[in-house]
């Protein structure tokens, strides 16, 4: 075995990629014209193994199996491409400027300046969380940055160019977002960034499954080429795209999503990103203890932001049609969700029940309290005239684009 190791050391450099779980080779010499065009680093394949065995056999008889044992052993040092990239960047200092803010300005989000600043804030958290998940196997970036806008707006292209060229091969596009397969689970440990397209075409069940995948701490699956199941850390961060603004339909909450509607996006081909500046800043913030997760107040603000992206739910509409919250000194009345369901006529509706109605009342901010083991909600019933006036105000609001003079 020592002879094989010496032969390899004289001719090639090798490293074991901890992300792909494959050995890579860099040639110190070539063995003919057919190998002169090999890139600097190449994943070992049958042809390369056969070439090494052929050249080694010229010096002494050797079994292919012995060569494979050495290549698959700890003789080959381990290498983590993401950590190697980050740890070899030039250090970032505040004097160099806010490169992540500059990156955020390449995406012109719809809305006022506050919305643009919010995008910059969320992008920074998301990027630092992505770096944290690359550096620490215990960290999972469990929120998805989503860009919503028309086709041809560079949404997927922007995400595809977000990884630096040295890591570009670890970007994965999921075009059939409606299915999450075993192979998709394995990609969580094999890619640094996964882009899920057409999120707006996914059903609630599919979105919930995707949300569960986003929060998985590790993956215990057997790769096609492996002999054993392995517990692999969740490496991938998530991004997504869609065309329709209203795509969130989860009544249990939307804090896993960071959606923004875009007006336009600068082409990353015409205006390349400052990768070293962006990632050296994100890495520095991570090492400085920057809080990339959302606290309670930030989650509340995120939930308010996400309301514009939620699909209309009939239980919300029914409650808003028949009830409102007390104003001023109004006492209102405390009713259980089951009674409210009867009053709005929901007992004859297939997709509405008391549980959904209770969640909707809570989400809409109605006060509640427990009485004799039953949760009751403080509501005011709209009179017939008030219901008519409420409909008229809604129509005016729609016709004016949401602005009432």
Enumerate the language-model features and the residues they cover.
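P-loop NTPase catalytic core of nucleic-acid-dependent motor ATPases
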Residues: 74-189
């Amino acid at each position: 075995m020592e002879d094989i190791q010496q032969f390899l050391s004289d001719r090639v450099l090798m490293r074991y990629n901890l992300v792909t779980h494959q050995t890579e080779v860099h040639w110190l010499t070539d063995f003919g014209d057919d190998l002169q065009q090999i890139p600097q680093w190449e994943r070992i394949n049958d042809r390369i193994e056969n070439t090494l065995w052929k050249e080694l056999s010229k010096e002494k008889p050797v079994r292919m199996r012995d060569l494979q044992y050495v290549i698959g052993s700890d003789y080959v040092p381990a290498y983590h491409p993401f950590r190697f990239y980050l740890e070899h960047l030039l250090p970032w200092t505040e004097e160099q400027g806010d490169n992540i803010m500059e990156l955020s300005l390449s995406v012109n989000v719809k809305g006022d300046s506050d919305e643009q600043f919010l995008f910059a804030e969320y992008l920074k958290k998301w990027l630092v969380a992505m770096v944290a998940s690359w550096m620490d196997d215990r960290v999972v970036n469990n929120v998805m940055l989503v860009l919503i806008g028309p086709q041809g707006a560079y949404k997927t292209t922007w995400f595809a160019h977000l990884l630096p060229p040295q890591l570009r091969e670890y970007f994965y596009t999921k075009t059939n977002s409606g299915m999450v397969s075993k192979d998709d689970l394995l990609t969580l440990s094999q890619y640094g960034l996964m882009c899920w397209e057409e999120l707006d075409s996914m059903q609630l069940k599919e979105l919930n499954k995707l949300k569960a995948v986003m929060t998985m701490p590790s993956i215990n699956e057997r790769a096609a080429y492996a002999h054993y199941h392995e517990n692999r850390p969740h490496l991938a961060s998530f991004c997504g795209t869609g065309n329709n603004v209203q795509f969130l339909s989860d009544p249990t909450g939307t804090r896993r999503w960071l959606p923004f509607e875009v007006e336009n996006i600068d082409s990353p081909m015409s205006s390349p990103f400052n990768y070293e500046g962006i990632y050296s800043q994100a890495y520095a913030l991570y090492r400085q203890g920057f809080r990339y997760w959302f606290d309670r107040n930030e989650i509340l603000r995120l939930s308010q932001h996400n309301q514009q992206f939620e699909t209309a739910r009939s239980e919300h509409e029914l409650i808003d049609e028949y009830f409102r919250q007390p104003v001023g000194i109004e006492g209102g009345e405390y009713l259980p969700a089951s009674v409210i369901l009867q009053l709005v006529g929901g007992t004859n509706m297939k997709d509405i029940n008391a549980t959904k109605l209770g969640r909707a009342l809570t989400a809409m901010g109605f006060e509640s309290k427990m009485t004799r083991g039953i949760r009751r909600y403080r509501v005011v019933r709209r009179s017939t005239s008030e219901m008519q006036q409420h409909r008229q105000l809604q129509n005016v609001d729609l016709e004016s684009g949401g602005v009432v003079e």
